[in-house]
Amino acid sequence: MIRRTIPQKTISNEVELNGVGLHSGQKVNIKFKPAPVDTGLVFIREDLSEDNMINANIKYISNTDRGTNIDNGIVRIQTSEHVLAALVGLGIDNCFISLNGPEVPIMDGSSKDFIQVLEKAEIKEQGILREEFFPDSPITFKDEESGGEISLVPYENYSIDTTVDYGTKVLGTQKAYIDDISEFKEEISIARTFSFLHELEMLLDNGLIKGGDLNNAIVYVDKPLDDSNMEKLKKAFN
């Protein structure tokens, strides 16, 4: 079922941030620009001369291992999850997101900096109502390999409830929920990227987290390290 009850929103002014890509380690500039109604959230790769745009659409998701990557066969965007969470969390429907590289900057590992700069851009309502999907019956998807499961059920209000368990005593079972998207800024946006210590060697060996450090991620120590591995990590993270 599609409902139209809330006006679409965009930003009033262009704003920007500078940072580094978590996995590429490359310096990157990101700009947020106002967009007309029914545009959606659109990434623009300034470093590509033509055919440089891609919509933030589920059909373009190419990989979700250590980040949400989208790819339309021409344009690729890596680690899009934090910036998209900020835009959705603030109720922004239409925005051009311009990058001078393939990866969104990691900032401090959360959505906080994106929230702050988007609020400075002054969010405004537009003249057309937003289309919102409401399920008529429960929808469930389960990934048999990972065990992850997501369910969407009919409900008159907004509610998200999540549980994660990585099978480690260091972290344990984690639960979180919000009953209104307006809670995103205070309750969710400051949540930061994390990793377990045992994963770092594998990530480095696969050419990832080149821009990672303790300023943009939390590392849970879940195993002892010998001297050689400790030196390897020290060298990687300066």
Features from the language model and the residues they span:
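Short acidic-hydrophobic catalytic motif
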Residues: 1-238
